[in-house]
Amino acid sequence: MNVEFTRSFDRQYAGLPRELQKQTKETIEFFLDYYASRQYPKGLRIHKVGRFLSLTVTMNHRIFVIPIHGGVKFVFVGNHRDAENYLKK
């Protein structure tokens, strides 16, 4: 499976505290383990938001993913307020 990360995602990830980076990495790995089967575990609280899939990292932090040909592209990681602003772009 093709997995891509935008430059903005990489910058956002780099700006997270270490513990949140660890949780984000674990969430991504967990999501990728289940993505092909589309049998998502409830703990990730995956849902559609516009053209994105939204994943829960913590109750206050989200990841946005876009399905692409042959895989997924991670485009955003951040808190709720930043996520709302990202969706307004």
Regions found by a protein language model. Name each.
Residues 2, 7, 11, 15, ...:
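Enriched for short, Lys/Arg-rich terminal
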Residues 5, 20-23:
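Hydrophobic/aromatic residues within well-ordered alpha-helical segments
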Residues 26-27, 69:
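N-terminal G-site helix/loop of the GST-like fold
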